[in-house]
Amino acid sequence: MWSLTASEGESTTAHFFLGAGDEGLGTRGIGMRPEESDSELLEDEEDEVPPEPQIIVGICAMTKKSKSKPMTQILERLCRFDYLTVVILGEDVILNEPVENWPSCHCLISFHSKGFPLDKAVAYSKLRNPFLINDLAMQYYIQDRREVYRILQEEGIDLPRYAVLNRDPARPEECNLIEGEDQVEVNGAVFPKPFVEKPVSAEDHNVYIYYPSSAGGGSQRLFRKIGSRSSVYSPESSVRKTGSYIYEEFMPTDGTDVKVYTVGPDYAHAEARKSPALDGKVERDSEGKEIRYPVMLTAMEKLVARKVCVAFKQTVCGFDLLRANGHSFVCDVNGFSFVKNSMKYYDDCAKILGNTIMRELAPQFQIPWSIPTEAEDIPIVPTTSGTMMELRCVIAIIRHGDRTPKQKMKMEVKHPRFFALFEKHGGYKTGKLKLKRPEQLQEVLDITRLLLAELEKEPGGEIEEKTGKLEQLKSVLEMYGHFSGINRKVQLTYYPHGVKASNEGQDPQRETLAPSLLLVLKWGGELTPAGRVQAEELGRAFRCMYPGGQGDYAGFPGCGLLRLHSTFRHDLKIYASDEGRVQMTAAAFAKGLLALEGELTPILVQMVKSANMNGLLDSDGDSLSSCQHRVKARLHHILQQDAPFGPEDYDQLAPTRSTSLLNSMTIIQNPVKVCDQVFALIENLTHQIRERMQDPRSVDLQLYHSETLELMLQRWSKLERDFRQKSGRYDISKIPDIYDCVKYDVQHNGSLGLQGTAELLRLSKALADVVIPQEYGISREEKLEIAVGFCLPLLRKILLDLQRTHEDESVNKLHPLCYLRYSRGVLSPGRHVRTRLYFTSESHVHSLLSVFRYGGLLDETQDAQWQRALDYLSAISELNYMTQIVIMLYEDNTQDPLSEERFHVELHFSPGVKGVEEEGSAPAGCGFRPASSENEEMKTNQGSMENLCPGKASDEPDRALQTSPQPPEGPGLPRRSPLIRNRKAGSMEVLSETSSSRPGGYRLFSSSRPPTEMKQSGLGSQCTGLFSTTVLGGSSSAPNLQDYARSHGKKLPPASLKHRDELLFVPAVKRFSVSFAKHPTNGFEGCSMVPTIYPLETLHNALSLRQVSEFLSRVCQRHTDAQAQASAALFDSMHSSQASDNPFSPPRTLHSPPLQLQQRSEKPPWYSSGPSSTVSSAGPSSPTTVDGNSQFGFSDQPSLNSHVAEEHQGLGLLQETPGSGAQELSIEGEQELFEPNQSPQVPPMETSQPYEEVSQPCQEVPDISQPCQDISEALSQPCQKVPDISQQCQENHDNGNHTCQEVPHISQPCQKSSQLCQKVSEEVCQLCLENSEEVSQPCQGVSVEVGKLVHKFHVGVGSLVQETLVEVGSPAEEIPEEVIQPYQEFSVEVGRLAQETSAINLLSQGIPEIDKPSQEFPEEIDLQAQEVPEEIN
């Protein structure tokens, strides 16, 4: 039973008896003197006599658990306590011996695992009555998920909404399951997909997650880790029919789970790991262990850990947290479990357990012992950024990837069945209906089949619908044999007097016609396999924009981002419009960005957020603005002229003098003649396809993406019919579709060898290069008006993203307290980066680029770099698939926090994938040039433009770029050889210390090791030239690469030295590019050809945050003012009837004392673990110990962090309750997010202007009526209730004495600011009272938000309510609340609480922000713009 390998004469340092295989303790124990060596101790041990009293700690668990590495490490440390002896009960004893024969012990550590006889352990505890570390009776409950959830609910711990399905014949009332296609109903509770299905037994790890059909359907099947897999995707969508299960709501966690490990109620270690539901691949390190990352818990999460520990009476307890929607939810409690591979945790755990045991048992053994109180030396690990600028925010707007050609058919329908369908799905509410779900499309198909059957019986019956159109509708809906829900949709629009009547204007005779519906069927437009590869590769390339790392895990590009993301230092959100191709592009990009594997469906569901509910990325393409109609009509008129372009045509069609536009017009000359040629080529093409179909060899011919010759012919025949109308005129709107189709066939179906496609591509591209960009406006003013109309919500969101970046980081920080000796190999870069990725369609990309080009960001006459950028953009002919607009925000920590140089913005752009016809003709840009603090002089001066005329630039992805002083590229410059390119594909480029004689002192790059040494991380061999590491080496975003290169410089293989001379000719600035697919060795199964993606080009790298913020605000305001003028008359007529009662009252923060966690030594160990446990790997859990270095406190009144406000304000658009008007919308929208016991805490907002500018409002106070008037005029739709500004100011003045809920640490400048704010507040309120008549101009729909109390008291007096978005005249939409971290933590310095109260009082007063009217109004409805549908064919 007992394995005692040591002699009876042992030293005072007790040992850990493991049998003959014990390898010893390894390191000195706590009781050892540091000057004693191990040999001296061993010699002394023979002469020493062990002390009489010994506390025996018994370990009763299965051998696999009791001899695991974590248990061994902890017990070794536990043995270093004097008076403690650890004994392990063997598995044979536990299983086969009666409990009476088990040796007695004073303290028992026992826990259940598979095969463990828990009944015997309970019997033993009753027999011997030892001190239990983990309660045994409660372990029965932990084995049943139903009991776990019941206990969690009783303790008031948040958990996902769930229902239990008990398949028990004795209780049939608990087994009511109704399964639908996209939902299940369990005992009356409905769970729409995605939902989770868990077996009730906690020992059964076969958890299934079911996905909605709109995301591809199927399920992810989770299981206990087997090798490198933890889940697998299955196409099965039906729930299990046998067994009892818990069904619960799926929580979107952005692909990471948090595992929490408690040791007593006051210690909790947390780690993040990749969610097994994401792709099922277990990330392992070089030793084969699952990679996990340290995470800092918030105050509320520490409270949850304490509750779990106490409720289940388990001192050592592990549980799973899901962070979603601004809250933390417990989804599983595992009982006894240890952290793996954390030396710090082993030390902490052993110390806490030892102290707990000694505190409980030492008195009865008369052992002199007290808890050690010496201060622990925990140095702060310094950051490595030095003086480099730190990447803080990346915002990218990206077009979707390569797709199949989009196709559309319109028909007018009048059958009652279509009207019934329209009514059933609520079409009459808005007059429009969009049907995408499989069951909806099935209804349309059923109606179509029924009408066709009736037409066969009665060809001359009452059915008015055209047979040909109905048959096409039927064939499209029947394609593929099933509805995927993302590649076909039907739109119905109601016309009260028939479609033609509405089209032809006010015709009295027409108005008597019966109403009809316009049915628009859209299909195609699916993301192709090539598009998926493009998106995934671009995602991999994007990794390299983030801070890099060192150590064992730095063997591949972009490893810095991966560890950044998993440690929650990366605040990532991916948004996509509701189009399937856009969502799949976003999912594929996320897969590459985060090195995920497996199917796209689970990634899409968990990582991609739909932004279609508020117009952020979607636009109602069927309703064009009046400006778009004018532009389209003028464009069609010019292109219908059968004559060569004259000077006046150039003035009319190309007033902006765009280089690409002029080039295309030169090619076209006579538009009608070119259209004749295009039409003849299409006729020839359809003739060739028909001939191929007659060829017996083509019977089973499969084209790209499973298309057949019949479908291909259908595509081209429809274009042939539609392009030339019966009148002989051409429908110019079909030109983009023709170009789309021929580009697709040349790229993907080139093997057919159809004649004339190259010429058709050349001519249709020339026409498309005129039509497509000019549809978004011809003159600068039109381009800007249409652009802002498309992307106003997105512009506001980008502005919010930039302003939210400099927020308090205490929520997302890694653990700041870390032993230096534990820091080696820890994946924890000290950065916090916010990333917002917006995937959308061509319209938004065109529009956003137009805003930057024509909105007046900079004066090109004064800024040479911006002039070069505009010249480059002017030469871009097409914004192709995967076009990117990237905004990067850096912070220079060496600058004064109030300085304009503190934050630095860069603007980058890529026109997406290369067209197949563009070899050698692409315009050259300025290179990718992130600013570097070590090359300040290069910021604005580098990168002179090459000749923008076509044909001058190289087609190489890493083509040469000259800097200003350099001579032009010589004709003899060799291109980079395939050998170098191949080697680059297999390894990460790192710095070589070779120096160049060229200006600027660039350091060039070569391979660090052969491809075979490349660590496999999911990148494969397709990671060629992803990002210009030449730039990254000196870039503010990747300073660590320099260190990496210096440390690895001597490892350069001979192969790279052989090409050093050639490398010296490599351009100084290479581009961020994805160029793998051109190389023959880099093929991709299922892809005919994946075009190269153009590298990112820097448009400007010396912008300040203030410049960009003011520019975006100005553009938004200009649009708002323009619409206000159009609706001023309507506003004036409505405004007199508005009441101005019930003014907005700002929410008050209530004071609540910090939660006191009392130490209760008389209780079992799960109630307290003693003072030494107050410092945990997740930071101090108890407020009794105040650490000056810690940045978190403990409060039972948590506050949501700024992510909530961001999602709320930037996306959700504060809700307006019908009938209650504007006076209620001000606080309703925000209060939805708070629990009843919480009080709203204002999120941190830091103004980019110095504090000294706070005094500015004082000077502008006399003009307070003007901003109010401006705001009033800016709204085109009246609200029903109007707040009175004068009353509001009065109320703010009266409420000025309320104290704040929490007292953060106050910095000195902020104290000055607070006094200034008090002065401003008093002056403003006094002025409001004196000038109530002037001020009382009603501001409809606008709630003026008072000055905010924020972390460190950055009072944003100079920046008005950033996001008071009121969606006027439209129903309130659901507000997405995806927040990675739920709560904001503040440090509370107890000693300074009293003296800081006065400063708090000053700041808690309501301060109306009057110097800048609200910038944030949604796009108002243009009452004059009528939808004019296209001609029905």
UniProtKB/Swiss-Prot annotation:
One of the record's GO cellular component terms: plasma membrane
Biased composition (Low complexity): 1168-1186
Modified residues (Phosphoserine): 944, 987, 1037, 1073, 1145, 1152
Compositional bias annotation for Polar residues: 1005-1020, 1134-1143, 1187-1199, 1236-1250
Enzyme Commission (EC) number: 2.7.4.24
Keywords, comma-separated and alphabetical: ATP-binding, Cell membrane, Cytoplasm, Kinase, Membrane, Nucleotide-binding, Phosphoprotein, Transferase
Record bears the keyword Membrane: yes
Cited PROSITE patterns: HIS_ACID_PHOSPHAT_1
Residues engaged in binding substrate: 64-65, 224-225, 259, 273, 337-340
Any matching Pfam family: PPIP5K2_N
GO molecular function, one term: diphosphoinositol pentakisphosphate kinase activity
Region (Polyphosphoinositide-binding domain): 382-453
Described function: Bifunctional inositol kinase that acts in concert with the IP6K kinases IP6K1, IP6K2 and IP6K3 to synthesize the diphosphate group-containing inositol pyrophosphates diphosphoinositol pentakisphosphate, PP-InsP5, and bis-diphosphoinositol tetrakisphosphate, (PP)2-InsP4. PP-InsP5 and (PP)2-InsP4, also respectively called InsP7 and InsP8, regulate a variety of cellular processes, including apoptosis, vesicle trafficking, cytoskeletal dynamics, exocytosis, insulin signaling and neutrophil activation.
Domain notes: The C-terminal acid phosphatase-like domain binds PtdIns(3,4,5)P3 and InsP6. Despite its similarity with the phosphatase domain of histidine acid phosphatases, it has no phosphatase activity.
Protein name: Inositol hexakisphosphate and diphosphoinositol-pentakisphosphate kinase 1
Species name: Homo sapiens (Human)
